[in-house]
Amino acid sequence: MANTITADEIREHFSQAMSAMYQQEVPQYGTLLELVADVNLAVLENNPQLHEQLANADELARLNVERHGAIRVGTAEELATLRRMFAIMGMYPVSYYDLSQAGVPVHSTAFRPIDDAALARNPFRIFTSLLRLELIENRALRERAEAILARRKIFTPRCLALIAQYEAEGEFTSADAREFVQEALETFRWHRQATVDEETYHALHREHRLIADVVCFPGCHINHLTPRTLDIDRVQLMPRPVILMPECGIE
């Protein structure tokens, strides 16, 4: 097929598109990216040895590329479809984390590239958590949450069709890839309108705020992106007018 595109290229386009979308949803995040870029530049100007080390490792070009995002899903079926989606981008589940040990009712994995060449091209990963409804002790509330999740559709019909097309054909044209990225983004877009009534939301929130966040909205919105900084202490010690408060939007 002419004009096919690689998984690395799709992942790169997706990570850039997700960053742009998140900056629209959380304008403070764009300010954070500028702040981190300024700090990184200052660090490199004052540390020629580090600059040379990163240049020799071919890291300079990727310094301002986000490395990490995080999402939460509600059902095993949603997770299975995400696995298919991320595979198109060359991202595969790595490791297992049982966060219930820390009082968080999820278990998690990280979808990321796994071979050296793919990591060198674009190391973007998405930490993905699956809600554990069995940890809701109130049976009626647990069944209500299960029913809500069973009704929701977090993937657009066109996204599902493109996933199936890729699995059948093994490749995308550039046009297919662009459409796929745009359709995939809809799964991770923030929605202000909940899908439940106020009483249900508060009941789930009392059980755990994360349960309400997962169950009560129509998608698995990206809950944070993480830029790479060479000096986290300097970023956090910036003058007060520049500092971004997490509760204002960046989780």
Where do the language-model regions lie?
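Extended, well-ordered protein cores
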Residues: M1-E251
